[in-house]
Amino acid sequence: MLPAVVLALGMITSLAPPWLAAETGMPAAPAARCEALAARLRVAPRLKPVVADMCRRAPTFRRQVVRLTQQAGLAITVEPGDFPIGGRARASTAIARVDGGLRSADVLVRPGDSLAVVELIGHEFEHILEQLDGVDLGAWVGHNGVHRVGGDDSAPIETERAQQVGRLVASEYAAAGAATTALRVR
């Protein structure tokens, strides 16, 4: 006779809608679906393993990828960038609009340890989502967690929303890694 845990797992997996994979052509498992969708992004070869790992370990990142890849005509590039060592910037996103719609978002992240890169990618993806949500950052500067990084009016804008989401993605990523490591030790 099978242990109750195995039976329970069998019941849980049987609850997944079998039509999902057939109708969309996408894997039904969230991590696999995220990886398939992330393949639509232009990710530098050295960052592809990190993005794939983020899909497996961070549910918030999976939601970001689903939403970003659903936006018709939006091209997203993720590459390592050169940022001054002593400078405050660790990442940036250049967004291009055509006829008011987002057409491209070029994300640059400072190379480093994987957890820092994970936080930066999640953070920058949230900036793209802010734009898709129609947030007028210029109008919000100085209010509700929106500020310029630097002294003048042309300085980049930072948001508390992107900072929090970047930290959330990194914490999910780290927690999943710790859980995986703990499972291997047992």
Predicted regions and their residues:
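Bacterial N-terminal signal peptides
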Residues: P3-S14
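Post-HEXXH active-site segment of zinc metalloproteases
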Residues: L115, Q131-R161
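Long, well-structured alpha-helical subdomains associated
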Residues: A155, T159, Q163-R186
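Active-site recognition of the HExxH zinc-binding catalytic motif
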Residues: E119-L132
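Active-site scaffold of zinc-dependent metalloenzymes
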Residues: F83-A116
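Zn2+-dependent metallopeptidase catalytic core
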Residues: V51-G73
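Acidic/histidine-rich, surface-exposed loop or edge segments in extracytoplasmic proteins
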Residues: E35-L37, L41-P49, G101-V109, G142-V149
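N-terminal low-complexity, Pro/Thr/Ser-rich intrinsically disordered segments
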Residues: L15-C55
